[in-house]
Amino acid sequence: MTTRRNLLIGAASVAVLGAARVRAEPILTDDGLYKEPWFLESFLELADDLEAARKDCKRFVIMWELKGCPYCKETHFVNFARGDISDYIKANFEVLQLNTIGARKVTDFDGVELSEKELAAKYGVRFTPTFQFFPERAAPLKALPPQQREVARAPGYLRPDDFLAMFRYVREKAYESKSFREFVKSLPS
C-alpha cells in the first residue's frame, strides 16, 4: 500500500540518485593503458601543448604510464575516481598521457622529435606512474637541460590526499618557496 511516508521516501531517493554525479570510467586503450576521457588529445608537440594550457589558464602535466602497472590502474580507479580530485585537475591542468615504452613520436620543448620511450629516458622517468609538472611558459625551457625543465615531479603512486596536494602544490606555485613535504605539513589536517 502506498502511504504518504513511502511516497516521500521514494521521491527523496530519486532526488538523491538524480543529484549523484555519474563518473565516466577510464577507457582501456589499445596500448594497454587506462585513459580518462578528459585527458588531453594532442599532436604531441610539448611546447604547443604547454602554451595551449596556459592560454586556458591551466598548467601542463605529463602522466607517464606502463601497461600492466598496478599503481597506474590504482591512480585511475581510486585517485581519479574521487570527484574532488578529478574536478580540481580538470579545472586547473591539462594532462598528457605518455607510455614509458611507447613508440609515438613526441616533439620535446627543444624541438627534438623522439619516441615516447626515448623521451622517458631523456627525462629520467623510471617509475610509473610518474607525473611531470612544467612551468607556465614553454619558451625558456628550450635552453634548459631536461631535468631542469620541470617544476615538480611525482615519481610513483601517491595516496589520494597526497595526490591532490601535489596538484595544489603546483597550481599554487608553492614550489617557489618550499618543498612538497613542507607544503603537505602546512596543510590543515
Feature locations, PLM:
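Non-catalytic, surface beta->alpha helical segment in thiol-disulfide oxidoreductase systems
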Residues: P135-Y175
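Thiol-based oxidoreductase modules, predominantly thioredoxin-like and allied folds used
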Residues: I89-E113
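Structural micro-motif
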Residues: E116-Q132
